[in-house]
């Protein structure tokens, strides 16, 4: 997968190109990234990419023309993929959406806004989808872009061990269960005994019940979604009836 990023701060992306799973996957050729600074296509001495908003108000707005010129260069270089921008008013990013993008096998272009935002005319004519990573405001689109890239790369076959995907939050429709490692006792707290016995059937049962319990307590909406998608077993439903308040079906 090829990902092109339009950003005023290309150096920020070293965090994902030089470290961790994303770096290793990049070195193995599973994905590639190109960073494009719209200042490089400006024609004035100040390399201007922003201006005051019409109608007044605080801050500056990123101009449409430098972004359009940068996108034209990306298209000419061979990336014809979907264009994504980032803003709190966008569609909430979900694991399901990430998996859809990976399954499509298509390239992506990510536009990272700054200041008060991007001229709406560019968004209307050239951006296919605006994504939000939560109900809060950041200084720019670079951090959301890196969040999305990390989530995407993890789903590319070969990026991480296959079994890791199976146990991650959302892969089964539920949140992940708690994890423990050595020592067995830390600050007088023991690892749950079931994890020390080596009985894999019991461990699997405990893990599933922990996932159910955590999901019910923190994301009950996911229980309803998993039920609607047929991801809850009869054993799951029995545990829910016995251990939680009645849930709507």
Show which residues each predicted segment covers.
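Structured adenosyl-cofactor binding patch, chiefly the S-adenosyl-L-methionine
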Residues: 118, 122-169
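Short, structured active-site "lid" loops
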Residues: 49-70
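Glycine-rich, flexible N-terminal cofactor/catalytic loop recognition
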Residues: 1-40
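Hydrophobic/aromatic beta-strand patches that form the interior of the parallel beta-sheet core
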Residues: 4-6, 34-36, 82-84, 108-109, ...
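Internal, active-site/partner-interface "lid" segment
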Residues: 143, 155-194
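SAM-dependent methyltransferases
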Residues: 1, 183-249
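Short, surface-exposed acidic-centric catalytic microdomains
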Residues: 35-56
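S-adenosyl-L-methionine/SAH cofactor-binding core of RNA-modifying enzymes
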Residues: 63-114, 120, 157
């Amino acid at each position: 997968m090829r990902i092109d990023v339009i950003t005023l701060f290309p150096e920020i992306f070293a965090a994902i190109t030089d470290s961790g799973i994303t770096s290793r996957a990049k070195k193995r050729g599973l994905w590639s990234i190109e960073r494009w600074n719209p200042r490089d296509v400006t024609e004035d001495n100040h390399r201007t990419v922003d201006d005051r908003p019409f109608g007044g108000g605080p801050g500056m707005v990123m101009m449409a023309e430098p972004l359009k010129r940068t996108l034209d260069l990306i298209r000419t270089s061979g990336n014809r993929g979907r264009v994504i921008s980032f803003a709190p008013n966008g569609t909430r990013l979900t694991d399901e959406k990430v998996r859809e993008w990976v399954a499509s096998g298509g390239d992506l272009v990510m536009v990272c806004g700054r200041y008060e935002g991007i001229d709406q005319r560019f968004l209307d004519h050239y951006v296919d989808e605006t994504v939000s990573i939560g109900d809060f405001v950041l200084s720019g689109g670079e951090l959301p872009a890196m969040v999305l890239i990390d989530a995407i790369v993890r789903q590319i076959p070969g990026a991480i061990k296959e079994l890791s995907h199976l146990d991650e939050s959302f892969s089964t429709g539920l949140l992940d269960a708690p994890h423990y490692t050595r020592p067995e006792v830390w600050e007088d707290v023991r690892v749950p005994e079931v994890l020390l016995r080596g009985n894999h059937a019991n461990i699997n049962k405990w893990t599933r019940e922990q996932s159910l319990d955590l999901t019910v307590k923190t994301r009950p909406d996911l229980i309803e979604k998993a039920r609607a998608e047929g991801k809850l077993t009869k054993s799951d439903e029995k545990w829910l009836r016995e251990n939680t308040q009645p849930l709507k079906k």
